[in-house]
């Protein structure tokens, strides 16, 4: 929005919408969905048939497709269902909503979602090793960990409709296809670089305007989501973002004091979202016992290449 290519209240679907090329819409109320509704999960999308982002093999069967559905095909599938509520009504977390946002970014920018985020958000924030995930262990990035699901013997039908049985974290789910709904590969350090670049605090230059930083936190109704964040506790001015799926969990918190932290795992358990909340409680309890924080560690300082500085050879 800071670039003027979008507005939070821009319509997404319909003749005047950003994604006007997706024309088959069952519920006319969907034409009222805005970028803001997608960001705070009030678009009204139904999950009566489950979360399509994690039912790709079923969507292939239901839609009689020959290949894995594209983002537009998944969005079109969702729009052939009635909304569960009017846009701007009650909030319900929606992965498909964040896939729609990914396509909004692509159409508005003329670039792939990954390329645009890297060039205009991540690299300016100093995050040079964040990428959209790949689906199989042998395709992992050079510094990427191995993921461990809840049960090493757990297998589900491959997302690609082949009928093969795969681990959920490696081919069972289409992780790459999640795009903005949860496909990013990152380290905790890079996550903190990003948070420090959008927190509105002095010290690290923000990549967003003051107005956009404030807008992210603006909540007008109890129970609503902050824009891009899971929760904003106005009384303590604390921002929280969580995430969990087979093979990984994440918890990020930013406090009014300027202290932020990220906790990422390469495993998961059956507790799902409640596990990430337990992580937050554990870290807050540990932090309350810290009397003094080190001041000699700045992750934003350029560290010289030791070998070049000393002239050593490999």
Model-inferred region functions:
Residues 21, 139, 269-270:
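Flexible, glycine-rich phosphate/dinucleotide-binding loops
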Residues 1-4:
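Juxtamembrane transmembrane-helix termini
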Residues 249-271:
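Short, well-ordered beta-strand elements
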């Amino acid at each position: 929005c800071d670039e003027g290519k979008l507005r939070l209240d821009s319509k997404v679907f319909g003749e005047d919408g950003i994604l006007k090329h997706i024309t088959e819409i069952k519920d006319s109320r969907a034409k009222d969905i805005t970028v803001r509704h997608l960001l705070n999960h009030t678009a009204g999308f139904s999950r009566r048939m489950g979360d399509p982002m994690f039912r790709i093999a079923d969507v292939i069967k239901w839609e009689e497709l020959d290949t894995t559905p594209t983002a537009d095909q998944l969005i079109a599938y969702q729009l052939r269902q009635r909304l569960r509520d009017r846009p701007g009504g009650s909030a319900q977390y929606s992965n498909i909503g964040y896939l729609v946002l990914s396509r909004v970014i692509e159409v508005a920018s003329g670039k792939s979602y990954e390329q645009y985020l890297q060039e205009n958000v991540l690299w300016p924030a100093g995050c040079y090793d964040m990428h959209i995930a790949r689906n199989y262990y042998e395709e992992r990035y050079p510094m990427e960990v191995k993921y461990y699901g809840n049960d090493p013997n757990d297998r589900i039908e491959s997302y690609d409709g082949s009928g093969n049985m795969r681990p959920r974290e490696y081919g069972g789910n289409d992780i790459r296809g999640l795009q903005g709904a949860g496909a990013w590969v990152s380290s905790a350090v890079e996550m903190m670089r990003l948070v420090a670049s959008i927190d509105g605090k002095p010290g690290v230059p923000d990549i967003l305007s003051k107005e956009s930083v404030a807008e992210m936190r603006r909540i007008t109704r109890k129970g609503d989501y902050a824009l891009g964040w899971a929760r904003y506790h106005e009384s303590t001015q604390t921002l929280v973002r969580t995430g969990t799926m087979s093979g990984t969990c994440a918890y990020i918190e930013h406090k009014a004091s300027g202290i932020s932290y990220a906790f990422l795992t390469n495993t998961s358990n059956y507790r799902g979202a409640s596990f990430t909340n337990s992580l937050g409680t554990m870290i807050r309890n540990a932090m309350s016992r810290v009397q003094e924080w080190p001041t000699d560690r700045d992750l934003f300082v350029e560290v010289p290449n030791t070998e070049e500085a000393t002239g050593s050879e490999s």
